[in-house]
A protein has these predicted regions:
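Membrane-interface amphipathic/juxtamembrane segments adjacent to transmembrane helices
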Residues: 47-97, 101, 271
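Active-site scaffold of zinc-dependent metalloenzymes
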Residues: 82-133, 137-144
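Long, well-structured alpha-helical subdomains associated
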Residues: 12-30, 34, 38, 160-208, ...
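Short, compositionally biased, intrinsically disordered N-terminal export/targeting signals
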Residues: 1-12
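Transmembrane alpha-helix/interfacial motif
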Residues: 37-45
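Catalytic Zn2+-binding segment of zinc metalloproteases
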Residues: 136-162, 169-173
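Cytosolic juxtamembrane segments of membrane proteins
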Residues: 56-64, 212-223
Length: 276
């Protein structure tokens, strides 16, 4: 560690860190942040594991899903469901090095589903993962039948961008010492983890609202008993995964920020005037 002392002529000295310290801090912060982000898949495992089990129960949901599309009024608004399954070309690639090239691979395996607001389309495997369709129709309701849900949906992408930007900012050297007057930039640096978490909140909130509306639609469309209970459990696990993503993202930014701060923040040293 190298420390350089500078003075601002007000009996205040700053122990400033060297360029080598900044580089070391950047590398360690980047590595630590990457390690934390690698835990993300673990949050979705409970959801994926249950969804695989629900494939054999698909018939309990598929009819109600199509009924819900019609009864909800979404079909009249132009919402469609595309049954997304493997074609012959895809099947040749499964189990080979070409498998990652399969378009919508996770959806075709019945492990995911999506709603695209721009074209009002739900994509899922109707032969395996119809249970996910009610949640996706919940996204469609947010998009087309509710102002609050629509606002949340539009805030998702900017929130992702903000969180990613804060991850980068967390790696920038600190110029101001503790106790110095803050400006906007130093405030952002000192609070980047909190701001990153806030950036992820619209996604969590919109997902929760989609699950709530999807569950209500499933119940109104005839899903009941153990099938409804399993649906609620699956949607709860999905929400936990999004909460986990938000928490891990902010934790990653926090750790990177603290490491960078440790290696780069100047230390403010006030020397009493009687020593002059």
């Amino acid at each position: 560690m190298t420390i350089n002392f500078t003075n601002n002529d007000n009996n205040v000295y700053y122990a400033r860190r060297s360029r080598n310290d900044a580089v070391e801090g950047f590398l360690l912060a980047s590595m630590a942040s990457g390690v934390v982000m690698r835990t993300l898949p673990y949050f979705s495992k409970p959801f994926i594991n249950q969804l695989k089990q629900e494939h054999i129960n698909n018939k309990e949901y598929v009819g109600s899903l199509l009924k819900g599309l019609s009864d909800s009024g979404l079909e009249k608004l132009g919402v469609t469901i595309k049954n997304t399954v493997f074609n012959k070309e895809d099947l040749i690639k499964v189990g080979t090095n070409l498998e990652p090239l399969i378009q919508d691979k996770e959806i075709k395996f019945g492990l995911n589903a999506t709603y695209t607001p721009r074209i009002k389309r739900v994509k899922l495997n109707l032969d395996k993962a119809s249970i996910c369709g009610f949640h996706e129709l919940g996204h469609a309701m947010n998009n087309l039948q509710g102002k609050f849900g629509n606002v949340l949906q539009k805030m998702r992408y900017p929130g992702y961008v903000l969180a990613g930007l804060l991850g980068t900012i967390s790696l920038f050297p600190r110029k101001k010492a503790k106790g110095d007057k803050q400006n906007v930039w130093s405030f952002i640096q000192d609070n980047c983890a909190k701001i990153a978490f806030i950036g992820m909140l619209p996604t969590v909130a919109e997902e929760a609202l989609a699950s709530y509306k999807g569950t209500k639609l499933a119940k109104a469309s005839g899903v009941d008993g153990s099938a409804l209970k399993n649906l609620k459990r699956l949607y709860g696990k999905a929400l936990i995964s999004y909460i986990g993503y938000a928490a891990v993202t902010s934790l990653s930014v926090y750790i990177a920020s603290k490491i960078t701060e440790h290696f780069t923040r100047p230390k403010r040293i006030e020397i009493p005037s009687q020593f002059y």
